[in-house]
UniProtKB/Swiss-Prot annotation:
Species: Aliivibrio fischeri (strain MJ11) (Vibrio fischeri)
EC numbers on record: 2.1.3.15
Protein name stated in the entry: Acetyl-coenzyme A carboxylase carboxyl transferase subunit alpha
Catalysed conversion reaction: N(6)-carboxybiotinyl-L-lysyl-[protein] + acetyl-CoA = N(6)-biotinyl-L-lysyl-[protein] + malonyl-CoA
Gene name tied to this protein: accA
Chief location bin: cytoplasm
Pathway the protein acts in: Lipid metabolism; malonyl-CoA biosynthesis; malonyl-CoA from acetyl-CoA: step 1/1
Matching InterPro entries: Acetyl_CoA_COase_a_su, ClpP/crotonase-like_dom_sf, COA_CT_C
Entry coiled-coil feature ranges: none
Length: 319
């Protein structure tokens, strides 16, 4: 169970702490300890009801915090729980290997696929190595190389999006960050194999979109997808990052709103309390949806698949 509770989860944390304390007393088996099973059960039921109530009415700002939860599963966690025979491929064959973006060949239910996704890292050392999940141009060029390889070998491409955005450093700009992102948009719109994109945490701006063009775009229940962070939006509009909660509500960055606007296709349920509560269950939910969608896309020949993707992209926006 997660030890990191968000501010709005504090009442839940207090109840869970009480339950754990009573369990510890019960486990010790002290001669004077009362039979606590009934009290533990009552507290567990109360905690469950509180969770259901809390998570049934989350605002956009609370969802944004869940999307960034430090124990939320990342692409390597999904690879572990969903795929077999994963073989990571490194480098863009031009400059370097970007650890913020992971990719390689794996099997999904026995079927060869190309898996690509952002990896934020856990702990200070890994976060620095992974650049906090913010790819540089070489990361996106690595993704392009892997997607083109997938097309040559007729393998579907599956992406996992979870980034605050593309790295905005001077070196990244000098090496063509915007060109790398733009090229990926072009490549992904032209791939002759099925492409399924999954927003599993933060979907931040062009850094997310660079691996986000596909035949299906799915979002986890408590993920976000937007052109800027709520804090960034608040700083620009109101010169006050403390107004991030108001910005989050106005931006429409949550899955239900994006589904309503037909910018995404599917909302995938998370376990009660969020994906960080149960990595395996979350991965299983995504896996089942991927298998269903791949089966649907297999019915299209290359020409029909590209036409379907083109029509999907051209449907975006208002006329």
């Amino acid at each position: 169970m997660s030890l990191n509770f968000l501010e709005f989860e504090k009442p839940i944390a207090e109840l869970e702490a009480k339950v754990e304390a009573l369990r510890e007393i019960s486990r010790r088996g002290d001669e004077n300890a009362l039979d606590l099973e009934k009290e533990i059960k009552q507290l567990e039921d109360k905690c469950l009801e509180l969770k259901k109530k809390t998570f049934s009415d989350l605002g956009a700002w609370e969802v944004a915090q869940l999307a960034r939860h430090p124990e939320r599963p990342y692409v390597l966690d999904y690879i572990e729980h969903m795929f077999t025979e994963f073989d990571e491929l490194a480098g863009d064959r031009a400059f370097a290997d970007d650890k913020a973006l992971v990719g390689g060949i794996a099997r999904l239910d026995g079927r060869p696929v190309m898996v690509i996704g952002h990896q934020k890292g856990r702990g200070t050392k890994e976060k620095v190595i992974r650049n906090f999940g913010m790819p540089k141009p070489e990361g996106y060029r690595k993704a392009k190389r892997l997607m083109q390889m997938a097309e040559r070998f007729n393998m579907p491409v599956i992406t996992f999006i979870d980034t605050a955005g593309a790295y905005p450093g001077v070196g990244a700009e000098e090496r063509g960050q915007s060109e790398a992102i733009a090229m990926n948009l072009k490549i992904m719109s032209e791939l002759s194999v099925p492409v399924i994109c999954n927003v599993v945490g933060e979907g931040g701006s062009g850094g997310a979109l660079a691996i986000g063009v596909g035949d299906y775009v799915n979002m986890l229940q408590y993920s976000t997808y937007s052109v800027i962070s709520p804090e960034g939006c608040a700083s620009i509009l109101w010169r006050d990052s403390d107004k991030a909660p108001q910005a989050a509500e106005a931006m429409g960055l949550v899955a239900p709103r994006l589904k309503e606007l037909e910018l995404i296709d599917t909302i995938i349920d998370e376990p009660l309390g969020g994906a960080h509560r149960d990595h395996k269950a979350t991965a299983e939910n995504i896996k089942q949806r991927l298998l269903e969608q791949l089966k649907e896309l297999d019915a299209f020949d290359n020409e029909a698949l590209l036409e379907r993707r083109y029509q999907r992209l051209m449907s975006y926006g208002y006329c």
